[in-house]
Amino acid sequence: MDIINCSDNDLDLIGKSLALSHDEMLLIKKYFTEIKRNPSDVELQAIAQSWSEHSCYKSSKFYLKKYLSNLRNERTILAMEDDAGVVKFNDDYVYVVKMESHNHPSAVEPYGGAATGVGGIIRDVLCMGAQPVALVDSLYFGDPDNKSGFLSERFIINGVVSGIRDYGNRLGIPNVAGSIYFHEGYNTSPIVNAGCIGISRKDKIVRSRVQKARDILILCGGRTGRDGIHGVNFASRVLDLKNGENRNAVQLGNPIVEEPLIHAILELNDLGLITGMKDLGGGGLSSAVTEMLYAGNLGGTINLDSVLLKDDNMLPWEIWISESQERMLISSDERNLPQIKDVLDKWNIEFSVIGRAEEKKNLEIYYKNEKVFDLPLEFISKTPVYQRPYKKPRNRCKSEPFRDDDINKSIISLISSINVCSRAPVIRQYDHTVRGATIVRPLTGLPNNETHSDAAVIKPVDDSFAGIAVTSGSKPMLCTIDPYGGALESLIEAYKNIIVTGAEPDAIVDSLNFGNPENEETMYSFVETLKAIRDFTLKFKLQLVSGNVSFYNKNVSDIMPTPNIMMTGIIDDVRKAITTEFKNKNSLIYLIGSINGSLAGTVYSKLKDIKCYDYHNSNINDLCNVYNIIKENKEKILAAHDVSDGGIIAALIEMSFGKNIGFNVNLKDIKMNLENKLFSEHGTAIVIEVPLESEIVFNNLGIKLGYTCDDITVMDGENMVFNARISELKNLWDSGLGKYL
């Protein structure tokens, strides 16, 4: 391709096909003009892959470095360096954690996009040398009644859930936690965030880099095909759902190949045969080879003829950037090759030696005895970085006075509404107990009568009762109104979800989903989100160990800002984990912490179409106090549930479901309007159940609301607010989501 003599118009056409800007194409033209030759198609495609938004974070890197750099603590092993974060678990083990988005593929082909998102996040953990032990997914869908898009919303919902189910279940890795959220702002543009936790002995962690010159590069696992070509490019621009080429950019997943690949990789690692490793995700070989060599300050030579193909007619550039799944790139000393072959043959894993690392700065690639690529790795890897401008949106919305004339009806509507109702129709499709290490499941309580858990707890090491708690979610409607406040509340909720299990909050992983970064208001939301994450992480001395940014999530308009927060915690003894359901009748119920009172961005305000945009940041110093109360008194706590979606009324009702134990509470000591105290979702509040003998202790720590009993009664002073049977509410709660699946 004659880039050197291209006109500006022709450069723009080429750039558009590769998701590169005019200025980026000028940089490429300038470079090749200086070296007095045109790029090969392999070189041009590789540059486009490396410089894509998806791969190099060119719109976010400046702000990520400014606000989120070095948020570590004494437990951090690796953070923001390799394919996943690594955190100390105990003296002998570490855990590995990562979350990624797979949004654009899931919008085009929901089943395949979601399935390969799961497969990819598992390999991100695997390539660090860890055994994957748990999956997490947070899903954001449009209005399930919407049929106006390229694909109906129900088709997207069912495709995504089925893809996650089939891939995870067939691999035998439990799906233990996550969230599901619905809003018309995601119509035709779902957000699919998949997370994974792995466990490894601390001396078995593998880095995503080549360690020394002369090491061979081995490609193993699935064969390379035309699926997933230009995947990173189409994920780096606004999605055109009418473009048929997008379907070719969606990878094809095969868990039957990945399952033995996991066993083989772990065995090779146990034998000490792997010196560096990376999974092949976005960008394929182009990304994996380039990043491993550059991280090791080495160059190398690759022979594309050695790559095992699904289609022998593939062109060299297609081989180089294909994103075919279930592939791993391993570096090793050449003397280890016979042992490596024995292990891979035992697991029936295909492999080939495709090249080696060398003491030079360039990467050379050959195909059919012809050099098709010869570039310095520094040119490919030192990608453009933009300091995108941002501005605060004008406050176009004003709150309007509101009074609810039928609280009883509102509570009934709320409990069956799509963002409060039971997630069991989805959760039950996932195997959350395979491997036998899930202690607190996503549903808790009596069989067929369960309620939601706030966080899952897993026991990852056989000879230890220590465990990991994990939760994931976001508050998109509030993020739209107040990006800093919405991100802060997302972090507060995650923190509460961890501490109510009895665990110690440990690490944060973010997956930041936003619209077009060229929109200054979108960038404002993004920057405010980063500030909130920084402030919260520093305040609570946590560690931010891994993250992901997904831009260009847009169809008709940008999606709502969706900073998904995955948080982990460490629990000393999983046998003492606290769950959400009420345990006994005639126990006492207390409110610990405080309800913010704002109805901005709540399920209730959406349900009632309330114009409410007034929000003030919750007091995170109060959250410190809540943490200390739970930590110092967890042996006395029978049940605990955070106040979040649906407010305190939803929290209390959900606690009643697990064992059919009701409550009689009086909200008179919560000093705000009835609508606000019932339905505000923000703040530091947690509802706990304690035995009668602990009354004196907790009278000094929180607000006594009432006691557990047979049915449900809510008072506000002398006024009856709500009265119902548990069974009636459970039927409503159970029926909200099932009709869409």
From Swiss-Prot:
Residue positions binding Mg(2+) 2: 124, 279
InterPro entries: PRibForGlyAmidine_synth_PurL (IPR010074), PurL_linker (IPR041609), PurM-like_C_dom (IPR010918), PurM-like_C_sf (IPR036676), PurM-like_N (IPR016188), PurM-like_N_sf (IPR036921)
Location of this chain's protein in the cell: Cytoplasm
Alphabetical keyword list: ATP-binding, Cytoplasm, Ligase, Magnesium, Metal-binding, Nucleotide-binding, Purine biosynthesis
Function, in words: Part of the phosphoribosylformylglycinamidine synthase complex involved in the purines biosynthetic pathway. Catalyzes the ATP-dependent conversion of formylglycinamide ribonucleotide (FGAR) and glutamine to yield formylglycinamidine ribonucleotide (FGAM) and glutamate. The FGAM synthase complex is composed of three subunits. PurQ produces an ammonia molecule by converting glutamine to glutamate. PurL transfers the ammonia molecule to FGAR to form FGAM in an ATP-dependent manner.
Residues binding ATP, per UniProt: 57, 98, 510, 547
Family (UniProt): Belongs to the FGAMS family.
Residues at the catalytic site: 54, 102 (proton acceptor)
Gene name in the database record: purL
Name of the top EC class for this enzyme: ligase
Name of protein: Phosphoribosylformylglycinamidine synthase subunit PurL
Catalytic activity: N(2)-formyl-N(1)-(5-phospho-beta-D-ribosyl)glycinamide + L-glutamine + ATP + H2O = 2-formamido-N(1)-(5-O-phospho-beta-D-ribosyl)acetamidine + L-glutamate + ADP + phosphate + H(+)
Pathway this chain belongs to: Purine metabolism; IMP biosynthesis via de novo pathway; 5-amino-1-(5-phospho-D-ribosyl)imidazole from N(2)-formyl-N(1)-(5-phospho-D-ribosyl)glycinamide: step 1/2
Any GO molecular function: ATP binding
Quaternary structure, from the entry: Monomer. Part of the FGAM synthase complex composed of 1 PurL, 1 PurQ and 2 PurS subunits.
Binding site for substrate: 101-104, 123, 251, 323-325, 550
Catalytic activity, EC: 6.3.5.3
Binding residue positions for Mg(2+) 1: 100, 548
UniProt-listed GO biological process terms: 'de novo' IMP biosynthetic process
GO CC annotation: cytoplasm
Domain of life: Archaea
NCBIfam families noted in UniProt: FGAM_synth_II, PRK01213.1
